[in-house]
């Protein structure tokens, strides 16, 4: 039940000509203080039309407004404030959640539509660092949120398995690498070689040329180059899979950049057919001067392709394969120009589906105020952070609940959840200063706090069993009402998170629910025998449903015991 819509309907019967119901709904506010009611309508916009002060309009509207849904209507200055019938709303909200369970909050505006989400996309032969966490977890959450809105979701891990860096890595391996040493710890050793290349190239410019030459060989199918590339890729994917399992992240496919190698010439042909290619200093470009951007480089002067060519080819392939209505690219803000160019080239080709494509940037994880960089070796490995978080969770369990069953599994859920939630509680465009201490806190605005609240609610339900199907629910006290109002917002919160591509909307919401429930738990005798006992237990159950589902949308698990 959307009680704001009910309020808007009642007001639309008064403002039959002045405002539409949607306009009224858009104006309705939620008062910050409970004494001003559950919803408020500001009358400022009507002053000119009525030729009266907003306060007088509010008073007249309050006198006309009558609905059994409201227990009280009052004019306070320029606002019409209403108080909803708590019995009616709590009964409707709780019955809806009890009936729908984990389906509660589902929206259907995405039904029969497809969204492609491109996220995570680590580079082969480089360690999976904390810097990869944001794209991975934001994309994973957006995938769950889109599914909750009815979309068919294609989650693509566009692995960075092609490009000039492989020429550099092959050069470094052939100069300084040792096969036996690399086999012992492939990712770390290959990463060391990559960093060494960037150090050595400062004093030896010829290394850059060697790197370019090896990448050209790789593009031409040179046997040795391809064999080394396949080895680097295989070892990297093994490590990535282990980390994705720890994070609980899954993808529809791992079609990386190399997948499109044999399709790029066809796309370049399409650009030629549309007369969009120009030669510039031996390279092929699409001129974007009219759009106020530098030219989009399609092929370098040495004949090598560039990632823009692959991204353009991939976009057309994905549209032809999946027929997407939306396509999200969860990639850092440093790629903004690239995406502007990329989308503009597709528009120049006349593809209308580009209107559904969107770059979803995010802030950096900083270390000592600086962006982490794989070239300079300033890297904190995600796997090490996850392992430390899980170990800390184990220690907490041993101290607080040593007899807990499935300690290892719960520690994994809580430790990984702490890292994921820390990332997603921040608005995605905000930078995050890396701090292991803050990330692993198990109190305050953290994942473990929400998980513990869920476990606490589950423990109450284990003490009592109720046949909710036969109940009518009525909750009048302020603490229960605060929780009910929050639970009622869940579908709307999910829609907002989807429209904004913003998982932090969900994070903030589950924190609010957890905090409100804990106040309820501390002030209401839930298990005390009374006519409201079944209603109170129904509210506890509804909280477990919403917290578990809210955490799932973030990619965080909800243990029933901690």
UniProtKB/Swiss-Prot annotation:
The keyword Protein biosynthesis applies. It catalyses: tRNA(Arg) + L-arginine + ATP = L-arginyl-tRNA(Arg) + AMP + diphosphate. A motif ('HIGH' region) lies at residues 122-132. It is found in: Cytoplasm. GO terms for cellular component: cytoplasm. It is an enzyme of class 6 (ligase). Its main location: cytoplasm. Keywords: Aminoacyl-tRNA synthetase, ATP-binding, Cytoplasm, Ligase, Nucleotide-binding, Protein biosynthesis. Pfam families: Arg_tRNA_synt_N, DALR_1, tRNA-synt_1d. Its EC number is 6.1.1.19. One of its GO terms (molecular function) is arginine-tRNA ligase activity. The keyword rRNA processing does not apply. InterPro entries: Arg-tRNA-ligase (IPR001278), Arg-tRNA-synth_N (IPR005148), Arg-tRNA-synth_N_sf (IPR036695), ArgRS_core (IPR035684), DALR_anticod-bd (IPR008909), Rossmann-like_a/b/a_fold (IPR014729), tRNAsynth_Ia_anticodon-bd (IPR009080). GO terms for biological process: arginyl-tRNA aminoacylation. NCBIfam families: argS (TIGR00456). Belongs to the class-I aminoacyl-tRNA synthetase family. Monomer. HAMAP family: Arg_tRNA_synth (MF_00123). This is Arginine--tRNA ligase 2.
């Amino acid at each position: 039940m959307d009680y704001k819509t009910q309020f808007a309907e009642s007001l639309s019967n008064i403002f039959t000509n002045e405002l539409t119901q949607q306009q009224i709904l858009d104006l309705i506010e939620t008062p910050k203080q409970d004494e001003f009611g559950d919803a408020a309508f500001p009358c400022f916009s009507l002053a000119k039309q009525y030729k009266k002060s907003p306060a007088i309009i509010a008073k007249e509207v309050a006198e006309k407004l009558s609905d059994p849904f409201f227990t009280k209507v009052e004019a306070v200055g320029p606002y019409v404030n209403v108080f909803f019938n708590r019995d009616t709303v709590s009964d409707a909200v709780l019955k809806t959640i009890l009936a729908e369970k984990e389906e509660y909050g589902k929206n259907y505006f995405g039904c029969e539509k497809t969204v492609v989400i491109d996220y995570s996309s680590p580079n082969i032969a480089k360690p999976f660092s904390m810097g990869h966490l944001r794209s991975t977890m934001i994309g994973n959450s957006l995938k769950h949120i889109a599914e909750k809105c009815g979309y068919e979701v294609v989650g693509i891990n566009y692995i960075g398995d092609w490009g000039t860096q492989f020429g550099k890595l092959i050069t470094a391996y052939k100069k300084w690498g040792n096969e036996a040493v690399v086999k012992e710890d492939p990712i770390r050793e290959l990463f060391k070689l990559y960093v060494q290349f960037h150090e050595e190239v400062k004093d030896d410019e010829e290394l850059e040329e060697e790197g370019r030459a090896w990448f050209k060989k790789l593009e031409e199918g040179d046997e040795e180059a391809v064999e080394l590339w396949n080895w680097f890729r295989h070892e990297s994917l093994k490590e990535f899979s282990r980390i994705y399992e720890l994070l609980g992240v899954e993808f529809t496919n791992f079609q990386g950049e190399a997948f499109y190698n044999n399709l790029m010439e066809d796309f370049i042909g399409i650009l030629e057919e549309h007369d969009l290619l120009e030669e510039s200093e031996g390279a092929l470009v699409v001129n974007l001067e009219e759009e106020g951007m530098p030219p989009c480089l399609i092929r370098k002067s040495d004949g090598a392709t560039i990632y823009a060519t692959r991204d353009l080819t991939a976009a057309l392939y994905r549209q032809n394969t999946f027929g997407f209505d939306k396509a999200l690219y969860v990639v850092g803000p440093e790629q903004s120009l690239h995406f502007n160019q990329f989308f503009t080239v597709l528009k120049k080709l006349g593809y209308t589906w580009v209107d559904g494509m969107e770059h979803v940037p995010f802030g950096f994880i900083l270390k000592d105020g600086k962006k982490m960089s794989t070239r300079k070796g300033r890297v904190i490995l995600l796997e090490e952070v996850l392992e430390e978080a899980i170990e800390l969770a184990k220690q907490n369990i041993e101290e607080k609940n040593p007899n807990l069953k499935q300690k290892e599994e719960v520690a994994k859920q809580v430790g990984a959840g702490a890292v994921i939630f820390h990332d997603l509680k921040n608005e995605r465009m905000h930078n995050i200063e890396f701090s292991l201490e803050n990330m692993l806190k198990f109190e305050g605005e953290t994942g473990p706090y929400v998980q513990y609240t869920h476990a606490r609610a589950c423990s109450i339900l284990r003490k009592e069993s109720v046949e909710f199907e036969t109940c009518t629910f009525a909750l009048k006290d302020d603490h229960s009402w605060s929780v009910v109002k929050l639970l009622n917002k869940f579908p709307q919160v999910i829609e907002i998170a989807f429209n904004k591509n913003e998982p932090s909307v969900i994070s903030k919401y589950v924190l609010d629910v957890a905090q409100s429930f804990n106040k309820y738990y501390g002030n209401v005798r839930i298990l005390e025998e009374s006519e409201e006992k079944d209603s109170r237990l129904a509210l506890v159950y509804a909280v477990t449903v919403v917290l578990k589902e809210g955490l799932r949308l973030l990619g965080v698990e909800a243990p029933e015991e901690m």
